[in-house]
């Protein structure tokens, strides 16, 4: 699919073999591949075949295979792709179910289940928290959030991302961008509760 003037391709279709050929072209310059989206796990059979092909190729099997996901994949889905992946980065956009439904239109229970399952199987690379001023509820639920994080593998990185208005649309276009002071406050509250492996943005807009 392309824009009306066909000047900016929006989607490209590849077979697994074609994507492997592209991966092989750049293999000498990369340490791994990360599939993102949208939500990449919506194409789970393709991802399984792609990761499986990487792990089966002598010249590619050194590459890590990571998934950037919203965490809504079922546990059965994670079990299917787990043998061929090296890790996942998962977004937890709020702590309470009510706030998560407000922000995304869906419950976060499956996301929490995904996070726990991936951590228990040494497949959770990074847990991401998106701070949206006056919207997210991390600080209001800091005790529960910290307890949850501390129940995970201690090697997991916690990344706090700052919401910004660029590229968003709809109601979110009117939401305030997060600033450094707000991110540092959340970071400090987590550190006080023994959550230590935290990354914060280098640039704020």
Model-derived features with residue positions:
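Conserved non-cysteine loop/helix-boundary elements of the Radical SAM core domain that shape
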Residues: 8-15, 35-45, 99-115, 133-144, ...
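Conserved Radical SAM active-site core
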Residues: 1-84
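Surface-exposed amphipathic alpha-helices with a cationic face
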Residues: 48-60, 119, 150, 187, ...
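Glycine-enriched alpha-helix->loop->beta-strand junction motifs that scaffold or abut catalytic
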Residues: 82-88, 122
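Hydrophobic faces of well-ordered beta-strands that scaffold small-molecule active sites
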Residues: 31-33, 65-67, 88-90, 125-127, ...
């Amino acid at each position: 699919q392309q824009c009306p003037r066909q000047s900016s391709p929006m989607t490209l279709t590849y077979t697994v073999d074609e994507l492997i050929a592209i991966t092989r072209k750049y293999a000498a310059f990369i340490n791994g591949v990360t599939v993102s989206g949208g939500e990449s796990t919506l194409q789970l059979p393709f991802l399984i075949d792609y990761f499986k092909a990487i792990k089966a190729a002598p010249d590619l099997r050194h590459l890590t295979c990571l998934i950037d996901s919203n965490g809504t994949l079922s546990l059965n889905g994670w079990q299917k792709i787990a043998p061929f992946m090296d890790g996942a980065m998962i977004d937890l956009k709020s702590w309470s179910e009510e706030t998560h439904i407000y922000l995304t239109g869906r419950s976060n229970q499956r996301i929490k289940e995904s996070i726990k399952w991936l951590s228990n199987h040494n497949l959770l690379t990074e847990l991401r928290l998106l701070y949206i001023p006056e919207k997210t509820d991390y600080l209001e639920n800091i005790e529960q959030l910290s307890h949850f994080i501390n129940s995970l593998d201690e090697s997991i990185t916690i990344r706090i991302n700052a919401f910004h208005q660029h590229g968003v649309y709809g109601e979110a276009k009117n939401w305030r961008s997060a600033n450094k002071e707000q991110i540092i406050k959340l970071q400090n509250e987590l550190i006080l509760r023994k959550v230590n492996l935290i990354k914060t943005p280098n640039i704020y807009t």
